[in-house]
Amino acid sequence: MAGKKILVVEDNEDNRRILVYRLRKIGEFEIREATNGMEALEQVRRDPPHLIFMDLKMPIMDGWEATRRIREMAGGDTVRIIALTAQAMHGDEEKALAIGCDDYLAKPVVDPALVREKLERLLGVAA
């Protein structure tokens, strides 16, 4: 997975650091960060990542809207998106998949094996 570009979109600095730390332990990724959906859209327009970890509840623009807009962009359908949420409500996973997310994770992301499995499945290569 070396060289794969991953964008972590998370407004909570602690959650963002934990996920970035886990990703660095798994593989040699080019990791970028954003703190809201608007920043994520700007980064996707400039240089689309291979995969995005997208928090669903953020200020300025939430992950629901950012995912919808990414999917509407030219080439946006090739970016893999994993939805993240700390307050998993009934139906959130189904809604995330319906708006275009490829997978779903509850926060905090504490299981490195689960993250590795999702990366391998969505990026198509072994970590």
Give the label of every model feature segment.
Residues 13-32:
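Two-component/phosphorelay signaling modules centered on CheY-like receiver
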Residues 47-53:
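Active-site beta3 strand of CheY-like receiver
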Residues 34-38, 93:
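Conserved Asp/Asn-Gly motif in the active-site loop of CheY-like receiver
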Residues 58:
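Receiver (REC) domain active-site loop signature in two-component systems and cognate sites
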Residues 10:
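Conserved acidic carboxylate
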